[in-house]
Amino acid sequence: QSGVIFANKDIDTANKLKDLLITNYYRISTSTDINGVEVCAAIKNIFAMAIGAATGLNKTKIKDNTYLNTSAALFRQSIYEMEIFVDFLNGKKETVKSLAGLGDLYVSAAGGRNSKMGALIGDGIVFSKATKNNMPNVTVEGAELIFEIGQKVKKDFDEKKLPLMIAMINAIIYDKKLEIKWENF
């Protein structure tokens, strides 16, 4: 099974496309929130890196799935900050709780380039070294987006409002170890 979301300012057009392409294994939802869907598609990559960092950020000495609680905390914060960011860019907060937000973030955080880079950063490896030694010639969309929007985000938002996103921005742009201010969650 697979699910996607089609966004169009005209819901009838989106629904016609849905009717043409839907199958018993390819499920399609529709939305008129073009801004929200597009913003979620982009910023979920930043948050997938953050969630991927959980294995290294977990500070217990127990070796098993204890990082899952850290992942859950990061996932929840990611959704919260995605809502703030989508709203800021004139999207609808509820879009974050659709396939465009929650669904896409889950898939990206479960595996892939952003999650892999996040795991390296969570282990204390700075971005430039992680890129050079572990992921050369690999495009990490979340990092690319941070280089594009990071400074503007830091200018427009207080660190207490988007603590996770700003922690990722600081780690990538300034090439330093990831420092999350958990007290701001």
Segments predicted by a language model, with ranges:
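Short, small-residue-enriched loops and turns at beta-alpha junctions
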Residues: 37-38, 107, 138
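Internal alpha-helical scaffold of NAD(P)-dependent oxidoreductase catalytic cores
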Residues: 1-95
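C-terminal active-site/capping subdomain that shapes the small-molecule cofactor and substrate pocket
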Residues: 111-185
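Small-residue-rich helix-loop
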Residues: 68-103, 110-111, 123-137
